[in-house]
């Protein structure tokens, strides 16, 4: 081999080596973007050596605290670095991350709602995080260590621990968590350590009774009641002080309850099995005798009374003066999970019977396919009035003007077709113009949706809507209820709706810049936040779509059609093709998280300029969510999704962050969608 050839070979080998090292070191683009976002959200701390707010190679350049496997980030260890700010909203993109330790910093805000589902170790302790434990924890099937102690977490824990068999340690101590322990704690068969001290938990700790490996429990300084299970009294460490435990002997567990004998060797010999079976049979027999005796006593009591065995007089259809049984004075008997009793009420001077579906399982006694009974102080009923109720009190409509039917007919040309602005599931909307130049939008409610037997229902609706005031809500001006016709009068917006700007073809309808779109999204989110978190009781909109987002002269959003959710139960029409969340097979299934999904679809419209459902497109692209969802996390295809009307005039980082917010809003599982307050905070960062 000649010298020239040798030189060429050496150069080739050197170049190949350099090329190979670069290829191997190149970090996955989604991982880079997620770390860039986290770095910016933490206020770009100089203490994190090598980190960058844009681009970079975390794996190849060995960013501080980052461990990789191949081109994927697998570990983040940045404990005790004095970090501030938040963690951003893209950590869920780190698909290979198994270890996350951000403890002992000054991080604040909500924890990312979507965390990597391959985490085995999660430590966010000793920070200033608020909000709640992210529901995405429920998807971490390999998680063994969870420590979010010594923060400012608040609210009730979601029932999300069903599928975490490898979880050995939970530390949620020194927060402001409330409510009862999730029943799914009983599924944590691998749990060894549980620290819940210094919170505001209440109820019993019976869910911990049969955990086979539990050896360290600290529930001190909460508001727990009931008895400490005997099964926990023999574990290695048990701290229970500062609660409201019951005194005296604890009641026996119900028949059939699984019992964990912590003093046995685990062999499970035949004698112990026989003893356990004997105990179960004995307890069951005694329970059966007691139940039988109770039934006899009840039958005897009923025979000695004049009351029927029904809640209502079957012949006259009137309520009985006495309830089926009388609980303590000033308490309410509530039936949960019993649709058949939905409208039945018995009234007594000391007690009331309310029947409604249960949102949370708070049952004290429950039977499969049967109602659940609770005793709740009746004062709670008055403390949380229902806006949709039709009480005997006269509705307050003093804040709005009562228009005559003649006035509205004159100003709307007798509701002629040329004054028709639109038609929805509830009724038609007309434009009304008064002689003094004032313009209003008049919404006539479909008469079939108003119960004829309750003439005051419309007045209650007016009273409810007139009490809602927010700068991003379309204001109710007045109403009309004459000759069987019921109308709501709103302020009129000459700019029309967001739907008009995004989806109509004329040039006038496409002036929305990217910054304007973000501002529209933020204003709408604030309006929804007002309904969900400020109104008392909270309201669900149930019909969020771009045609219900009106724009004023400065293109500020005004959410309309609020306060009418009760009507959506009475119509079989689709509330908005492409907007409905997957769980909403009918209008009654809507929740606040369904509103978040619908708003996510509106954000997709702002991002892409496409309709939520477009039958004119190829089949794979007709459903906006189905088409866009897989591409929202792909940096290479995201630019191709953006509305062509923007002509490329936007910051890629802003679009990427906007897409991340959209992706968690349109999650299929309702529990994985963020509360709208989280969405508001995320959008604020983009303005």
From Swiss-Prot:
Segment forming the signal sequence: 1-25
Cytoplasmic side: 300-687
Residue ranges of every copy of the Protein kinase domain listed in the record: 415-686
LRR repeats by residue range: 96-118, 119-140, 142-165, 166-189, 190-212, 213-235
Glycosylation site residues: 187, 263
Knockout consequences: Plants show a reduction in leaf size, but no apparent defect in pollen development or fertility.
Compositional bias ranges of the Polar residues kind: 346-365, 378-394
Ranges where the record places region Disordered: 239-269, 310-329, 344-365, 378-398
Positions with a binding annotation for ATP: 421-429, 443
Location within or outside the cell: Membrane
UniProtKB keywords: ATP-binding, Glycoprotein, Leucine-rich repeat, Membrane, Nucleotide-binding, Receptor, Repeat, Signal, Transmembrane, Transmembrane helix
GO molecular function: ATP binding; protein kinase activity
Alphabetized InterPro entries for the sequence: Kinase-like_dom_sf (IPR011009), Leu-rich_rpt (IPR001611), LRR_dom_sf (IPR032675), LRR_N_plant-typ (IPR013210), PRK1-6/SRF4-like (IPR046959), Prot_kinase_dom (IPR000719), Ser-Thr/Tyr_kinase_cat_dom (IPR001245)
Primary location class: membrane
SUPFAM superfamilies attached to this UniProt entry: L domain-like, Protein kinase-like (PK-like)
Function, in words: Acts as a direct positive regulator of leaf size but not leaf shape.
Family indicated by similarity: Belongs to the protein kinase superfamily. Ser/Thr protein kinase family.
Protein name: Protein STRUBBELIG-RECEPTOR FAMILY 4
Species of origin: Arabidopsis thaliana (Mouse-ear cress)
Upper lineage: Eukaryota, Viridiplantae, Streptophyta, Embryophyta, Tracheophyta
């Amino acid at each position: 081999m000649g010298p020239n050839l040798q030189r060429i070979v050496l150069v080739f080998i050197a170049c190949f080596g350099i090329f190979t090292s670069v290829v191997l070191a190149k970090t996955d683009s989604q991982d880079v973007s997620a770390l860039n976002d986290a770095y910016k959200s933490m206020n770009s701390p100089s203490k994190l050596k090598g980190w960058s707010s844009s681009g970079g190679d975390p794996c190849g350049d060995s960013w501080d605290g980052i461990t990789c496997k191949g081109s994927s980030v697998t570990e983040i260890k940045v404990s005790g670095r004095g970090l501030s700010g938040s963690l951003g909203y893209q950590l869920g993109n780190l698909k290979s991350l198994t270890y996350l330790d951000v403890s002992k910093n000054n991080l604040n805000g909500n924890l990312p709602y979507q965390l990597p589902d391959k985490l085995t170790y999660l430590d966010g302790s000793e920070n200033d995080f608020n909000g709640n434990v992210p529901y995405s924890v429920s998807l971490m099937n390999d998680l063994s260590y969870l420590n979010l102690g010594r923060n400012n977490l608040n609210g009730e824990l979601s029932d999300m621990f069903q599928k975490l068999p490898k979880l050995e340690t939970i530390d949620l101590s020194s927060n402001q968590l409330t409510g009862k322990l999730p029943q799914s704690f009983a599924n944590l068969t691998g749990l060894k350590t549980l620290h819940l001290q210094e919170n505001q938990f209440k109820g019993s700790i019976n869910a911990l009774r049969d955990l086979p490996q539990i050896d360290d429990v600290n529930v001190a300084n909460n508001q727990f009641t009931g008895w400490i299970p005997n099964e926990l009294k023999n574990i290695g460490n048990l701290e229970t002080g500062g609660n409201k435990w019951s005194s005296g002997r604890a009641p026996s567990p119900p028949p059939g309850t699984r019992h964990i004998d912590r003093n046995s060797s685990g062999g499970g010999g035949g004698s112990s099995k026989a003893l356990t079976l004997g105990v179960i049979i004995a307890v069951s027999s005694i329970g059966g005798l007691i139940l039988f005796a109770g039934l006899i006593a009840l039958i005897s009591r009923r025979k000695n009374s004049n009351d029927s065995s029904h809640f209502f007089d079957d012949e006259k259809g009137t309520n009985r003066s006495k309830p089926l049984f009388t609980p303590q004075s000033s308490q309410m008997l509530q039936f949960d999970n019993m649709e058949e009793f939905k409208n039945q009420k018995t009234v007594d001077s000391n007690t009331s019977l309310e029947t409604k579906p249960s949102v949370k399982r708070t049952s004290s006694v429950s039977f499969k396919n049967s109602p659940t009974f609770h005793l709740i102080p009746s004062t709670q009923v008055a403390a949380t009035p229902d806006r949709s109720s039709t009480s005997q009190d006269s509705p307050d409509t003093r804040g709005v003007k009562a228009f005559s039917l003649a006035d509205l007919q004159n100003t709307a040309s007798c509701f002629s077709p040329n004054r028709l602005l639109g038609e929805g599931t509830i009724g038609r909307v007309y434009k009304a113009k008064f002689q003094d130049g004032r313009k209003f939008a008049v919404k006539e409610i479909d008469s079939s949706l108003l119960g004829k037997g309750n003439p005051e229902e419309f007045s209650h609706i007016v009273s409810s809507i007139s009490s809602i005031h927010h700068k991003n809500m379309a204001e109710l001006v007045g109403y009309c209820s004459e000759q069987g016709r019921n109308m709501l009068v709103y302020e009129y917006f000459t700019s029309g709706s967001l739907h008009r700007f995004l989806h109509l073809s004329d040039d006038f309808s496409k002036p929305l810049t990217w910054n304007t779109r973000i501002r529209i999204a933020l204003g709408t989110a604030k309006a929804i936040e007002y309904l969900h978190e400020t109104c008392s009781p909270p309201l669900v909109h149930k019909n969020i779509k771009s045609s219900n987002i009106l724009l004023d002269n400065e293109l500020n959003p005004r959410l309309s059609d609020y306060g009418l959710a009760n009507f959506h139960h009475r119509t079989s029409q689709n509330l908005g093709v492409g907007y409905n969340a997957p769980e909403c097979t009918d209008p009654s299934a809507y929740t606040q998280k369904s509103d978040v999904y619908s708003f996510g679809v509106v954000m997709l419209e702002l991002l892409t300029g496409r309709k939520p459902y477009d039958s004119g497109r190829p089949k794979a692209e007709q459903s906006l969510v189905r088409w866009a969802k897989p591409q929202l996390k792909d940096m290479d295809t995201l630019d191709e999704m953006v509305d062509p009307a923007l002509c490329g005039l936007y910051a890629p980082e802003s679009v990427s962050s906007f897409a991340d917010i959209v992706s968690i809003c349109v999650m299929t599982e309702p529990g994985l969608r963020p509360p709208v307050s989280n969405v508001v905070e995320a959008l604020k960062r983009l303005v």
